[in-house]
């Protein structure tokens, strides 16, 4: 659905038609991604009692309007959507950068639950990745694949188009692959490139520097001590082999958390568990929400 907000025309993807009588589950994608992340999840068990929504944040997907540069501004955009749809006490699910937006939102609105997947805090992004994201997004995505992917899924992921942004990501010419962000030769391991396509395509955006903008906002995002101590109804999903957002049991966010009940560590997966091990990821989310 398309919503006309004060400063944006917001695109909200619905897995089923929105029903105001149902509790809403809101997905907030990672840096440079959009609503198409929902193509990686199967949450049919939750359809009867829940709306499952994927937000295109400013500069992402099909949301139009001014780019915003901070986690806080993205949270305010989400609040505008909640107000227009009259969404009360949502279940927030954010992956990576989107997990920071979800965390910040949980300090601003009443929420039934917030699930932060694969986040670090502070979430510090290195200069090399920032430079790649600014100059050649294809290099940045390759960096994320190199350090973020631990294994490929057992079953090949069948992707849906989700509109024009899901098609034509690569153009081939004389053994090279041309993406919107650069040209490279993949003759050494073309099968790897094909296997990664369902995930890589999610970074294809009309706003070519949006990943850079998102990643910079990770570095500057901080909660106050009062906000951290006041966090409630927060659940965390980490990945055993995640090199981009490593689980640290001593992290300040986790000091007042019941580690047995509120933290799940997915085994043998990296930073993108919904790609690497979708069934286990779906089971984890459903078990948390149904508990």
Which residue stretches match the model-derived regions?
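N-terminal cap/lid segment of alpha/beta-hydrolase-fold proteins
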Residues: 1-9
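Conserved alpha/beta-hydrolase "nucleophile elbow" surrounding the catalytic nucleophile
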Residues: 29-31, 90, 94-96, 239
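Conserved loop-alpha-helix segment in the C-terminal half of the alpha/beta-hydrolase fold
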Residues: 44, 230-269
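Conserved hydrolase catalytic core segment
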Residues: 88-125
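Conserved alpha/beta-hydrolase catalytic His-Asp/Glu region
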Residues: 131-230
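Catalytic histidine-centered segment of alpha/beta-hydrolase-like enzymes
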Residues: 244, 269-282
